[in-house]
A protein has these predicted regions:
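Single-stranded RNA-binding regions, centering on S1/OB-family and related RNA-binding modules
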Residues: 3, 8-183
Length: 183
């Protein structure tokens, strides 16, 4: 169990993939980094939602009895968890580690890896236009998410169908050419 998460941490490092919304939805799978472990639960910074954090109560750490929470989660550990409740007014996100099947965890990790690649591709596209990654997200990244579902989908479409497929969706010719060149 610990070995899995240790590998997960070294694979992903501290690279952040962005989401187009401010708060996660209830039931959504999220990726976080545990930064504080207490006797009654753990706090994790959400990787996809900049500046947001989630609380995992000790009763949501494992389906079995938890004698010592540190046997299940450690600081700086990357975790995949399910959102139970979101309260934007209080700034709270409650999450669960135990309400996820292994296949869901694996699928989320694979999607995370793909989106990290896509973000790197977007960064390379931005550099070819002498722009920053933040500029890329503001100008085209969030729009690509709305149109294609995620940034990687836009790069797949550009690789398969060329820059015209992006311009037909309303992406500027400048960005369409840069994305197609990288794809």
């Amino acid at each position: 169990f610990f070995y899995f998460f240790l590998n997960f941490y070294f694979i992903f490092g501290d690279y952040m993939v962005r989401k187009n919304q401010e708060w996660p939805d209830e039931g959504e799978l999220i990726i976080g980094t545990v930064y504080k472990v207490l006797n009654y639960g753990a706090f994790a910074k959400l990787e996809e939602y900049h500046g947001k954090e989630a609380f995992i109560h000790i009763s949501e750490v494992s389906s079995g009895w938890v004698k010592n929470i540190r046997d299940h989660v450690r600081e700086n550990q990357k975790i995949v968890c399910r959102v139970l409740r979101v309260n934007p007014k209080k700034g709270h996100v409650d999450a669960s580690l135990k309400r996820i099947r292994e296949d869901q965890r694996t699928k989320k990790i694979q999607h995370w890896k793909i989106e990290q690649k896509a973000e790197k591709f977007l960064e390379l596209s931005a550099k070819s236009l002498d722009k920053s990654l933040n500029d890329a997200y503001e100008e085209v990244g969030y729009e690509l998410m709305d149109i294609f579902g995620d940034v990687y989908g836009a790069f797949e479409t550009a690789a398969d169908d060329g820059a015209k497929s992006l311009t037909d969706e309303g992406i500027s010719q400048e960005w369409a050419d840069a994305i197609t060149e990288i794809a």
